[in-house]
């Protein structure tokens, strides 16, 4: 299924962006509100089976919205990571928070990182940002090389909040915000770095432990936030 795919991380990102529709954005693509939109976590192989059941053939094909599967940011990152690794490009999923959504200053988000041998660094890419996303969010940067500060790993967000650089209430998803949420994402990020991805819905019971946090103050880290 991957044999006819391009080798460019940018082209692979574009392909993934056309395979999935984020459930929270379905209405923007003209998907009827009564449409069943499964949100179960899927491995890359299962996602490919579903993709082929909707539109058999090359993954390069331009897909109408009704021929795409439904998912979340985690699913985009899994597919992009899978394709990059197939091309022997070192890649990994990261869990943290993005600053380019309008729902929360630091919105819960998953992306993919790949190693650039030319630049000798890990490059962060967001496969969710298709043309519709970029237009509605006013995004002008390259989604295959996220500028510094547009995405923070969970660990960076933890340091920023604990150091007083930003209110913990500005970090999370919807009404679920604060240190407990950041810590959940720290566990998720650690696990995906160990090749043990967890469900985006797995909180590990962390909110119940919120009262146990230490009040130790940390010095603010040097993190540049994109304006």
Q: PLM ranges: what are they?
A:
Residues 13-14, 18-22, 31-33, 97-110, ...:
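His-Asp-centered catalytic microenvironments across diverse enzyme cores
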Residues 37-110:
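Active-site neighborhood of thiol-dependent amide/isopeptide-bond enzymes
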């Amino acid at each position: 299924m991957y044999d006819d795919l391009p080798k460019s991380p940018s082209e692979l990102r574009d392909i993934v962006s056309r395979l999935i529709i984020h459930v929270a954005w379905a209405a923007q693509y003209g998907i009827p509100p009564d449409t069943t939109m499964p949100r179960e976590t899927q491995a890359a192989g299962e996602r490919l089976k579903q993709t082929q059941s909707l539109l058999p053939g090359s993954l390069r094909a331009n897909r109408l919205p009704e021929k795409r599967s439904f998912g979340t940011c985690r699913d985009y990152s899994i597919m992009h990571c899978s394709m990059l690794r197939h091309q022997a490009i070192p890649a990994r999923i990261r869990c943290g928070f993005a600053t380019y959504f309008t729902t929360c200053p630091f919105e819960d988000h998953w992306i993919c990182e790949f190693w650039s041998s030319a630049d000798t660094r890990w490059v962060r890419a967001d496969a969710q940002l298709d043309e519709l996303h970029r237009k509605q969010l006013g995004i002008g940067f390259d989604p295959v090389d996220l500028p510094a500060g547009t995405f923070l790993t969970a660990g960076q967000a933890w340091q920023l909040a604990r150091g007083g650089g930003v209110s913990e209430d500005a970090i999370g998803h919807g009404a679920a915000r604060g240190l407990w949420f950041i810590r959940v994402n720290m566990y998720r990020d650690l696990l995906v770095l160990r090749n043990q991805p967890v469900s985006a819905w797995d909180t590990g019971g962390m909110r119940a432990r919120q009262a146990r946090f230490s009040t130790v103050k940390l010095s603010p880290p040097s993190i540049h936030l994109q304006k």
